[in-house]
A protein has these predicted regions:
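Conserved Class I S-adenosyl-L-methionine
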Residues: 186-248
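Glycine-rich SAM-binding Motif I of class I
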Residues: 47-51
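A short acidic, Gly/Pro-enriched loop at the edge of an enzyme's catalytic core
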Residues: 98-107
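Short, glycine-/aromatic-enriched active-site segment of Class I SAM-dependent methyltransferases
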Residues: 142-162
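A short glycine-rich, Lys/Arg-flanked "PGG" loop and its adjoining helix->strand segment in the class I
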Residues: 124-139
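Class I SAM-dependent methyltransferase SAM/SAH-binding core
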Residues: 52-96
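Conserved SAM-binding loop and adjacent beta-strand
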Residues: 8-25
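A short SAM/SAH-binding and catalytic strip from SAM-dependent methyltransferases
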Residues: 106-121
Length: 248
């Protein structure tokens, strides 16, 4: 199986975005989850967040991951941690998994691509679709990029290749339009961004140094360069927001 940038860059990250685990835990705490509560982690990567939530809040986590390499990695880490009885890894899309299972007390989608279904990107429509799979009083923990100001057209085109982004305020407006209460809305600080970027860039550099002749090395290096340029150029325009929305 081919090696991709995210297979390497995400391995050492606690949270695969510009967000600290401490801030994430504080946001989850506001959801008021009871022991044994059903939680979905959309795009769980290697399972680090799922494991932290299972330990810290004694919840039952359905960890969904479409990428087979990361899903296998998540299963291995969860088994090694002795948490297989509290975390179930589902390989596939979150939309299909949500349809197949009962409602959740918390759905967590942090930097997820089309979590409510392929082609559905309008924020209010995404939130409305996800809220259908929440219990009454359940919460959606949403984390994603936002535009701090209108970006140059080439930057928007590059960044929105895999998603659709709005302003910090517009994410919250979309949640209200979907019938959700905004419980909290925070913005990641520069230290969180620095940690996110440094960990990824170090992991990629180390892998390339160790595998200079790997067939996928040129593609990994090119992707790393593209992402670095995007984040460098986008720094004045891009923020990362994390929100807790509650269903009435």
């Amino acid at each position: 199986m081919r090696v991709a940038f995210h297979h390497i860059a995400y391995q050492p990250l606690a949270v695969c975005n510009a967000l600290s685990m401490a801030r994430l835990e504080a946001t989850v705490r506001r959801a008021g989850l009871k022991p044994g509560a059903p939680v979905m982690d959309v795009g769980c990567a290697y399972g680090e967040v799922s494991m932290r939530l299972a330990r810290a809040f004694d919840v039952r986590v359905t960890a969904v991951e479409l990428d087979p390499v990361m899903a296998e990695g998540a299963e291995a880490r969860i088994t090694a941690a002795g948490l297989s009885d509290r975390i179930s890894v589902r390989r596939g899309t979150s939309a299909a998994t949500l349809t197949a299972l009962p409602p959740f007390d918390l759905i967590m989608a942090i930097g997820s691509t089309e979590p409510a279904g392929k082609g559905l990107r309008d924020p209010a429509a995404v939130f409305a679709a996800l809220s259908q799979h929440l219990t009454s009083g359940g919460a959606l923990l949403w984390g994603d990029l936002f535009w701090k100001e209108e970006p140059p057209a080439p930057l928007r085109q590059l960044v929105e290749t895999g998603g659709y982004y709005v302003s910090h305020e517009a994410w919250q407006t979309a949640a209200r339009d979907a019938g959700l209460e905004v419980v909290s809305a925070e913005i990641s600080d520069e230290a969180e961004w620095a940690t996110y970027r440094t960990v990824m860039e170090t992991a990629i550099a180390d892998w390339l140094d160790a595998h200079p002749d790997h067939a996928d090395a040129p593609t990994v290096a090119a992707t790393a360069h593209r992402i670095k340029m995007m984040l460098d150029f986008g720094a004045p325009y891009l923020g990362f927001g994390h929100y807790l929305f509650r269903k009435g």
